[in-house]
């Protein structure tokens, strides 16, 4: 988190034409403010929060993390607020998702593209690497240098890309820098 917060430049103080700010979200379990890192607008802070949120909002499955249905104002008959996915099953799924790997770069052209990417200024937001926390719950993921090509910050992309939907601390025009790792494997 310290690394991401060090990249914050909400008012373009360095005059590079790019401003970015961290998304701060509330941990639904503890009520503590956390750094948002997942989702289009960095509205969730962990793989577990993202997974529980997807279960809740996408398919209506409640967890202990998000035990209440997200029905919106238009729904008349909303589901009941009972946990449908156990903590043990959620934790197993989170571990699986957390340990999924990203494929290695494949050829010289891809690596040559990285230089052009940097020269064009793309790496100002799509930062090539960062280091994972020494305190990650999974030992396999502690102190790892990863190459996600993101700064995990929110950037105001203007009215042409705005969706008019706020999420967490993000406005309708703000989006988390999309991670670009693994794109060539699609």
Placement of each model-derived feature along the sequence:
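Periplasmic c-type cytochrome electron-transfer domains
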Residues: 1-186
